[in-house]
């Protein structure tokens, strides 16, 4: 959800990149498919950005990237060129990861303290603050917040709040710290149970009541995959 991926599909047999894409923050459920070439070995290498920090590596604003799917060169031209130049010739995930990390450290150049503070406030409130309350904490207007997040995150404040609220709710259910739908309605500021159910199904594709019943299993899966609550996530 609140992530962005730069994905490279590499034809190991021919030693070339056959497809590259940048996927923006998504608020819908979907699937991805690995391109196949008969008789060739195809691998995938990807860089996953936190939605609130990807702007540091971008050459251009991220406005319009919500649910977007485009070539990495459109927003990350310098990074894309550096990765394309070396990824096919490097062998193994460790070598490619080390190279990608060195490139990212060299190219991280954009910083905006206000954007970082906005991310901290969003995560602290778990997406439950209104846009006006959020803007007030940053000492800016709601309109300024709208422009700021549109440029740096490619999201509206309302959309960013909705996604973080969903993820916080999801993780609380999985960790077993929230076990009742009505408690969830009150804690996360939903208008009523129907509102919560609509929002959860929109992002998760499953009924929230059913999800509560399988929370123990989901909690074990999260622990195995190293998924952490919002307050532990870094921007």
Q: Where are the regions a protein language model picked out?
A:
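Sequence context surrounding c-type heme c attachment/ligation sites in exported
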Residues: 1
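Alpha-helical bundle regulatory/interaction domains
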Residues: 4-119, 123-132, 138-142, 155-156, ...
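A broad, structural surface signal
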Residues: 5-9, 147, 198
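A secondary-structure capping/hinge motif
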Residues: 149-155, 199-209
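Short, conserved glycine- and acidic-residue-centered signature motifs
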Residues: 162
């Amino acid at each position: 959800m609140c992530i962005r991926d730069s994905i490279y599909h590499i034809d190991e047999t021919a030693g070339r990149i056959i497809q590259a894409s940048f996927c923006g923050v998504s608020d819908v459920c979907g699937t991805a498919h690995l391109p196949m070439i008969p008789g060739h070995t195809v691998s995938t290498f990807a860089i996953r950005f936190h939605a609130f920090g990807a702007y540091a590596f971008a050459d251009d604003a991220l406005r319009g990237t919500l649910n977007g799917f485009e070539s990495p060169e459109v927003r990350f031209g310098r990074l894309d060129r550096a990765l394309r130049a070396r990824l096919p010739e490097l062998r193994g995930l460790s070598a490619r990861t080390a190279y990608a990390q060195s490139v990212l450290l060299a190219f991280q150049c954009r910083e905006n303290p206000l954007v970082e503070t906005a991310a901290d406030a969003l995560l602290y409130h778990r997406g439950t603050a209104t846009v006006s309350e959020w803007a007030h904490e940053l000492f800016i207007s709601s309109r300024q917040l709208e422009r700021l997040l549109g440029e740096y995150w490619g999201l509206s404040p309302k959309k960013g709040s909705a996604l973080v609220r969903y993820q916080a709710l999801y993780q609380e259910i999985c960790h077993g710290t929230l076990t009742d739908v009505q408690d969830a309605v009150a804690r996360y500021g939903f208008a009523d149970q129907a509102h919560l159910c609509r929002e959860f199904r929109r992002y998760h594709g499953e009924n929230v009541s059913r999800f509560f019943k399988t929370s123990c299993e989901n909690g074990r899966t999260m622990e195995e995959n190293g998924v952490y609550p919002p307050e532990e996530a870094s921007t």
